[in-house]
Curated annotation (Swiss-Prot):
This is Glutamyl-tRNA reductase. Homodimer. GO terms for molecular function: glutamyl-tRNA reductase activity; NADP binding. Pfam families: GlutR_dimer (PF00745), GlutR_N (PF05201), Shikimate_DH (PF01488). NADP(+) binds at G189, A190, G191, K192, M193, G194. Possesses an unusual extended V-shaped dimeric structure with each monomer consisting of three distinct domains arranged along a curved 'spinal' alpha-helix. The N-terminal catalytic domain specifically recognizes the glutamate moiety of the substrate. The second domain is the NADPH-binding domain, and the third C-terminal domain is responsible for dimerization. It comes from the Bacteria. It catalyses: (S)-4-amino-5-oxopentanoate + tRNA(Glu) + NADP(+) = L-glutamyl-tRNA(Glu) + NADPH + H(+). CDD domains: NAD_bind_Glutamyl_tRNA_reduct. Substrate binds at T49, C50, N51, R52, S109, E114, T115, Q116, Q120.
Length: 457
């Protein structure tokens, strides 16, 4: 058994190629089911976002797994393999696990440490569970990756430092004013940067937002998204008198807010502090405005310094997470090693309980007049004896599973307790339940296909 990651992402694949391999929400579950029906594919989860399309699969053989995943992509999207193979990035076993942990923590994201991808990984996993394309291995691996993603963000605070200009502006406003809920925020300009600033402002709790723009049609369109008010640019002096914060990104060729305009505004404000953020290039605001009392002006260069410092903080946090990822991989591989012992322990318990049940039947034949209470007491105590006798052998079996010669040790364990047939039955039951293990032929010697085929180097 092996774990594969096959896919495209923003690092290696241009958007004009990525967009051809994006699974729609409506088709994603059908795609996972279709993939699982391919030869060699035992479990699968597909993560499809604007920045990546990645297939994670448990396969019985690496070369056939790679082949059938490529063939699936070709068939599903109607594109010849030769046209996209150069863009595909494939990682195996430890590399695939590491990549998933990096994705879930935001280390592989365009914006280092962003949290949106963790929700997307979780949703992909839930989608796969709903259509039964995961089994024993991915149920454990994805739960671990999602839990680790949450823990990594909590322990390192990697996502707490703004690394975009518009978000840095909002963070700076929060440092100056604290709670933004009661503050009046004006957005000058209804372009892309203005909309992003409005989104971040609203996400930080601001409820009173005014969009100011030359073209009212564009302003109205943006305002609808954020339940904001709209004013034309000729009302800018009035808005400046009322607002606590102004974020400007008009794209104008010349200064929009002059020092002279602000001097008049400040007389009307009667000393109330005004926070101005100019993220436009060329600048919208006269730099001389910063000379005015109780006016705090920041331009894109000021914010870039904040972003650079924050990005460095995120990089330091990322280094800590990289070390934690190594520990997570070790933890998962240790779990994999114990997986092979489950059918052995189950078989041993089943044989012991069968003996206990036969013993109870023998007692009842020899002592037919047992009361219900006596029968319950005997049943309870004979099971207690079984559990006490099995405690040490079960512990030993688990220890065997963690050793390099696990398969030989477990086979010896099986022979000693005479549970060969019971183990075969447990392996078949396990395979049917999880649809992960290869079919076990009744005449074949019992084996532990999961633990030995995953690379442990």
């Amino acid at each position: 058994m092996h774990i594969l990651k096959v896919g495209f992402n923003y690092k290696t694949t241009p958007v004009d190629i990525r967009e051809k391999f994006t699974f729609s929400e409506d088709s994603l579950q059908d795609a996972m089911v279709e993939l699982k029906n391919q030869k060699s594919i035992l479990e699968d989860v597909i993560i499809s976002t604007c920045n990546r399309t990645e297939i994670y699969a448990v396969v019985d053989q690496l070369h056939t797994g790679r082949y059938y995943i490529k063939q699936f992509l070709s068939n599903w999207f109607g594109i010849e393999k030769e046209e996209f193979s150069t863009y595909l990035r494939i990682t195996e076993d430890d590399g695939a696990m590491e990549h998933l942990f990096r994705v879930s923590t935001g280390l592989d994201s365009m914006v280092l440490g962003e949290t949106q991808i963790l929700g997307q990984v979780k949703q992909a996993f839930l989608n796969s569970q709903q259509v039964n394309t995961t089994g024993t291995i991915f149920n454990e691996l994805f739960k671990q990756a999602i839990t680790f993603g949450k823990r990594a963000h909590k322990e390192t605070a990697i996502g707490e430092h703004a690394v975009s200009i518009s978000y840095a502006a909002v963070e700076l406003a929060k440092k100056i004013f604290g709670d933004l809920q009661e503050k009046h925020v004006a957005i000058l300009g209804a372009g892309k940067m203005g909309e992003l600033a409005a989104k971040n402002i609203q996400g930080s709790g601001a409820t009173k937002i005014t969009v100011v723009n030359r073209t009212l049609e564009n302003a109205n369109e943006m305002a609808e998204k954020f339940n904001a008010d709209v004013e034309s640019i000729d009302q800018l002096p009035v808005i400046l008198q009322q607002a606590d914060i102004l974020i400007s990104s008009t794209g104008a060729d010349s200064i929009v807010v002059t020092k002279e305009m602000m001097e008049k505004v400040q007389k009307q404000r009667k000393g109330r502090a005004l926070f101005l953020v100019d993220i436009a290039v060329p600048r919208d605001m006269d730099p001389a405005i910063s000379e005015l009392e109780n006016v705090f002006l920041y331009d894109i260069d000021n914010l870039q310094h904040i972003v650079d410092d924050n990005l460095e903080s995120r990089k330091q946090a990322a280094e800590k997470i990289e070390l934690l990822i190594e520990e997570e991989i070790v933890t998962f591989k240790e779990w994999l090693k114990t997986l092979g012992v489950i059918p052995v322990i189950s078989a041993l318990r089943q044989k012991a309980l069968t003996i206990q049940a036969e013993t109870m039947q023998s007692i009842e034949r020899k002592i037919p007049n047992l009361t219900d209470r006596e029968r319950k007491v005997l049943n309870k105590h004979t099971k207690s004896i079984i559990n006490q006798l099995l405690k040490e052998p079960v512990t030993q079996a688990k220890e065997f599973a963690g050793k390099d010669n696990a398969e030989d040790s477990l086979q010896l364990f099986i022979n000693i307790f005479g549970i060969e047939e019971e183990v075969k039955e447990e392996l078949v039951k396990h395979a049917k339940k999880n649809e992960t293990l290869m079919k076990i032929a009744k005449e074949e010697p019992s084996s532990f296909p999961i633990i030995e085929k995953i690379t442990t180097a």
